[in-house]
């Protein structure tokens, strides 16, 4: 091939490449002009046709909470409603809210230019919600009327440009956000507790005029008794203290002399086994102190004793929640559930005269190895079910929580560990329903390696590390307390919360403080403005720690750290965002 033919071929190839580049540039420019036109049209429509008067501006949830409004509760109820009307608002679109990553743009041509398909809107709001989670102001700043719709518009069209300017492979990598790794827990500083932990356990906020009610009666396992019953919003385990305020007439007629009254408390949240759906599980409680409140109510302190089960057919009347000032009595037959405990396998091996070496610390390991050599059981199996090894591992895990009241009785220890190790709700139900102490301890042992967080129950924002729990009461890190209105709060004490996790409501106060010498201040989830607990700050100079937090069990849940991703918001948050936008655009 000569030089002239070669140059002619190269010239033709160069012209082809120029034509392809020109066509690509024209197509790219057309896409950009189309997106810009849609953006400008929607912006003009919002500004010219849909601008609400200033008095209809979005309100700050924190401000609403401070005014005593019920907006957060309304948001929760609204979020629990069905979305079908919202999803079907644009019949010409086949893209639902459940497919935010769809790349089908065919509907964009059929819809008016200022209308955006729901899946595009959902994707933009989802991204904004995830970004607001880690910023100051949280959802309150996100709902700022001055720039809310503008930010939604910008997010929608920035995502649209990203889809149109990249290839299919690159777009897939761009749209799919990598999962955030679990948050690394900051190093825990040493905690110095200069506070009498007996005071919260005594519930001294009730006053000093309470009188002792003697008598602690354990009922025979398997026996059936007729007693007064109430309901409770939290799960109580035997050994826990339940303080409450109630009309004294509910108990006085049934108070048998000097013996403490025993009554039953059922837990509606305790899901019964599938084969026993018509049963209510709970505990017996015995009153051990009482005193007048001065407002027609009586303070009572009671302690949970034994697990019980109630058949629905045996309930006489309508049971009421003990924390909601019940006005009528309800009685039922209750059955006392058993607690089975089997000693360690090696304890059943009779070593004769050598048994004296078992209690000598220097000979204990040698004695154990000799025992193992006389049995057919592998050493790993014996170690797996060793009660002593579970106790030691639990002691090491709780060492940083400043707890020195671990019981020695296996039955009491199994319930005590459930309260202080903070298991998930599913695990708590499993441990409560089992009659075997050994099985309960094995379930608890399976959670020793879990890294857990406290999450807001309403929006799933992470609030605190479970490893930051510590005991401000001799009963442990989780205790039931009663507020002045009679509502019972399950409170978990932590010495710190995550940055940008909380806001405040109202003013601090020292009245009816559960921790004498500390003032309390209501804290809210900074993302959804729901009440999640209290901040306690020392008002006396000699108390330590100076600041700690109490998380309300009804407002938080416990989950694994791996759940804490950037897109872990509750669906109702995004759904309500979409409804707000839709209302503004109608």
Curated annotation (Swiss-Prot):
GO terms for biological process: positive regulation of neuromuscular synaptic transmission; positive regulation of Wnt signaling pathway; protein ubiquitination. GO terms for cellular component: nucleus. It is found in: Nucleus. Keywords: Metal-binding, Nucleus, Ubl conjugation, Ubl conjugation pathway, Zinc. Residues 180-190 have a biased composition (Pro residues). Coiled coil: none annotated. Its main location: nucleus. Pathway: Protein modification; protein ubiquitination. Zn(2+) binds at residues 456, 459, 525, 528. Ubiquitinated. One of its GO terms (molecular function) is metal ion binding. Residues 86-96 have a biased composition (Polar residues). The keyword Nucleus applies. Residues 1-114, 158-194 are annotated as: Disordered. Residues 451-560 form the CULT domain. Residues 75-85, 170-179 have a biased composition (Acidic residues). Residues 226-452 form the Lon N-terminal domain. Residues 14-37, 159-168 have a biased composition (Basic and acidic residues). Belongs to the CRBN family. Substrate recognition component of a DCX (DDB1-CUL4-X-box) E3 protein ligase complex that mediates the ubiquitination and subsequent proteasomal degradation of target proteins. Has an essential role in mediating growth by negatively regulating insulin signaling. It also has a role in maintaining presynaptic function in the neuromuscular junction synapses of third-instar larvae. Likely a component of a DCX (DDB1-CUL4-X-box) protein ligase complex. May interact with pic/DDB1. This is Protein cereblon. It comes from Drosophila erecta (Fruit fly).
């Amino acid at each position: 091939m000569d030089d002239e033919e070669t140059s002619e071929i190269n010239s033709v190839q160069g012209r082809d490449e120029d034509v392809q580049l020109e066509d690509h540039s024209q197509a790219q420019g057309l896409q950009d002009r189309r997106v810009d036109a849609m953006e400008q049209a929607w912006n003009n429509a919002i500004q010219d046709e849909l601008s609400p008067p200033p008095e209809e501006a979005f309100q700050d949830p924190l401000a609403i909470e401070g005014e005593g409004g019920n907006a957060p509760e309304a948001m929760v109820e609204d979020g629990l409603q069905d979305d079908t009307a919202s999803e079907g608002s644009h019949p010409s679109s086949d893209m639902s809210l459940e497919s935010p990553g769809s790349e089908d743009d065919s509907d964009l041509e059929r819809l008016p230019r200022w209308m955006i398909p729901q899946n595009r809107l959902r994707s933009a709001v989802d991204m904004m919600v995830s970004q607001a989670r880690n910023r100051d102001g949280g959802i309150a700043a996100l709902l700022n009327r001055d720039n809310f719709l503008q930010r939604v518009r910008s997010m929608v069209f920035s995502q649209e440009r990203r889809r149109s300017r990249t290839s299919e492979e690159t777009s897939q990598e761009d749209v799919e956000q990598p999962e955030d790794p679990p948050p690394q827990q900051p190093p825990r500083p040493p905690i110095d507790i200069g506070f009498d932990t007996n005071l919260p356990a005594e519930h001294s906020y009730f006053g000093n005029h309470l009188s002792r009610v003697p008598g602690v009666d354990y009922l025979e396992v398997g026996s059936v008794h007729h007693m007064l019953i109430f309901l409770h919003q939290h799960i109580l385990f035997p050994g826990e203290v339940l303080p409450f305020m109630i009309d004294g007439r509910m108990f006085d007629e049934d108070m048998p002399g000097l013996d403490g009254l025993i009554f039953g408390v059922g837990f509606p949240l305790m899901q019964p086994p599938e084969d026993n759906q018509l049963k209510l599980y709970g505990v017996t409680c015995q009153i051990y102190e009482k005193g007048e409140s001065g407002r027609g109510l009586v303070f009572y302190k009671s302690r949970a004793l034994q697990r019980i089960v109630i058949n629905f057919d045996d309930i006489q009347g309508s049971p009421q929640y003990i924390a909601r000032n019940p006005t009528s009595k309800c009685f039922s037959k209750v059955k006392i559930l058993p607690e089975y405990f089997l000693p360690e396998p090696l304890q059943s091996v009779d070593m004769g005269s050598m048994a004296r070496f078992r209690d000598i610390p220097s000979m204990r390991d040698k004695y154990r190895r000799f025992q193992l050599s006389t049995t057919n059981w592998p050493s790993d199996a014996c170690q797996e079910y060793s009660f002593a090894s579970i106790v030691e591992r639990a002691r090491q895990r709780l060492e940083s929580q400043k707890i020195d009241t671990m019981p020695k009785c296996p039955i009491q220890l199994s319930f005590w560990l459930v309260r202080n190790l903070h298991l998930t709700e599913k695990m708590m139900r499993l441990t409560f329903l089992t009659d075997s102490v050994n099985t309960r301890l094995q379930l608890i042992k399976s959670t020793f390696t879990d890294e857990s967080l406290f999450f807001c129950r309403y929006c799933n924002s992470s609030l605190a590390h479970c490893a930051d729990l510590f005991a401000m009461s001799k009963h442990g890190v989780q205790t039931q307390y009663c507020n002045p209105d009679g509502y019972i709060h399950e409170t978990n004490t932590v010495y710190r919360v995550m940055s940008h996790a909380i806001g405040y409501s109202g003013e601090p106060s020292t009245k009816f403080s559960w921790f004498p010498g500390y003032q309390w201040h209501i804290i809210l989830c900074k993302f959804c403005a729901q009440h999640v607990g209290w901040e306690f700050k020392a008002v006396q100079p000699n108390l330590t720690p100076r600041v700690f937090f109490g998380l309300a069990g009804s407002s938080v849940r416990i989950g694994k750290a791996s759940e804490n991703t950037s897109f872990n918001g509750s669906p109702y948050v995004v759904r309500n965002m979409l409804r707000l936008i839709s209302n503004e655009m109608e």
